[in-house]
């Protein structure tokens, strides 16, 4: 039995979001659903298709029988309305203890110096990324550019380093999203886990069990 199902970076409203895979994962048996940031991407509902609304409907249904938590990401700044109608609890971060292990959840964008210090370039490249999506029906180019840009600015390593420096000594397991790079890194005093995203060809998520163990899964 999965105690906490952790997903992140679904980015509803974009064509690269792997929505069928999201629905498949949401059909697993779990007690708590924790969406670790960037469930949404665009608040123009004109860009939402039937599968986007189906996912939100699934979340709304789950919230009636499960704990459903949305930890805010940098694309979730105006998520209050949609979180309210879907029954999600909206938080900046989340901490819980399972079998004497302290788990800490935060999206990770706060530790991304690119967003913090270069907001205009962040806005520009995000716009370029979505423009390419319109013409790249296979999404291979847009995904490649996103992975390449993350590599150039070393976002995944910076996020991990700063995340661990701030929260590692107070918690046993740190869980982030944001970088779209699934990974597990073990340190002397904690473990850092990034759940990846649902915007790549191979999507990823994390299962946390009642004994405190966890797995990074791919679909």
Give short role names for the model-derived ranges:
Residues 5, 34, 69-71, 104, ...:
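Hydrophobic/aromatic beta-strand patches that form the interior of the parallel beta-sheet core
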Residues 153-188, 196:
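Hydrophobic secondary-structure block in the mid-to-C-terminal portion of proteins
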Residues 3-11, 102-109, 191-196:
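Active-site-proximal beta-strand elements of phosphoester/diester hydrolases
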Residues 7, 12-99:
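Core catalytic region of metal-dependent phosphoesterases/phosphodiesterases
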Residues 96-99, 186-219:
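Binuclear metal-dependent phosphoesterase catalytic core
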Residues 65, 69-72, 76-170:
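Conserved catalytic scaffold of divalent metal-dependent phosphoesterases
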Residues 12-15, 40-43, 72-81, 110-114, ...:
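Active-site environment of divalent metal-dependent phosphoester hydrolases
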Residues 3-4, 31-32, 101-103, 173, ...:
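Structural motif
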